[in-house]
Amino acid sequence: MGFSPLISCSAMGALILSCLLLQASNSNAQLRPDFYFRTCPSVFNIIGDIIVDELRTDPRIAASLLRLHFHDCFVRGCDASILLDNSTSFRTEKDAAPNANSARGFGVIDRMKTSLERACPRTVSCADVLTIASQISVLLSGGPWWPVPLGRRDSVEAFFDLANTALPSPFFTLAQLKKAFADVGLNRPSDLVALSGGHTFGRAQCQFVTPRLYNFNGTNRPDPTLDPTYLVQLRALCPQNGNGTVLVNFDVVTPNTFDRQYYTNLRNGKGLIQSDQELFSTPGADTIPLVNLYSSNTFAFFGAFVDAMIRMGNLRPLTGTQGEIRQNCRVVNSRIRGMENDDGVVSSI
């Protein structure tokens, strides 16, 4: 069954053009929303058209692209290090536990980068491709638009070890979540609660859900915060000792739509993973009022989400002469030049 985008495909060109013009009216000291206004004015059209096309056959891709951006930014900043494949110099972040056999959408990013290299050679960084893709993915799924500051450059290395420690776990308590966010500079409760709202669409594997269904914290009992009816439903999808890679919707009501239903689910004991439910079920937590607010006020949620996304997108960006503009998001440019010198062939990478 295909995807019917909440914004029609025919309106995509006009929509992205209007977004680009709006972005041109904004500015930022290091990163600027109008960074590609003259050098690659088609960047939003190219990325947006590819996402629309992918959504027709893969309704998960919007959430997957947003997650890629999140996982990139939490590891040494938004520098596209998550997109690099293994090399002789470093191990890929794709092999890290939070990403292995889980992170997806790399081929879609490749498709975007290939198209952009044809239209605007060596101009748009992979970090900005991923940032723009996450923005448009949210927009096409019913969420807000925001002026994305641009001008990031790409890392020339990956950080496997850091990816294993910096990314929040689905089994984290609220205290652990707060520390993980604060460690990267996102220290406001609204950062944590709003960005967690990215789980309003997409899916998770049973392996990240099963422990709280059968043996929560070694009690041989389910997580007491789970709604009993929801527990029965989840056990049917994720049987004990079953296939851990089976996918379950984060949001049982509107699984492919970016909306405030996620927060209503938390209030009803229907958060899919432990780290989500912790936002509402931790006694006395300062996150509870925010969950209550966002569950009843779309404007408040969207505003907080936009603010948090911009803050996250500004984490330790490489700018100016730092890093590089990768020609291929999977490899650093020096490797491409080496292969050209040795073989005269780049397409095999």
UniProtKB/Swiss-Prot annotation:
Compartments where found: Secreted; Vacuole
Catalytic activity: 2 a phenolic donor + H2O2 = 2 a phenolic radical donor + 2 H2O
Swiss-Prot/TrEMBL keywords: Calcium, Disulfide bond, Glycoprotein, Heme, Hydrogen peroxide, Iron, Metal-binding, Oxidoreductase, Peroxidase, Secreted, Signal, Vacuole
Chain positions carrying an annotated carbohydrate: N86, N217, N243
Binding site for Ca(2+) 2: T200, D251, T254, D259
Signal peptide range in chain numbering: 1-29
Annotated GO biological process: hydrogen peroxide catabolic process; response to oxidative stress
Protein name according to UniProt: Peroxidase C3
Gene source species: Armoracia rusticana (Horseradish)
Gene: PRXC3
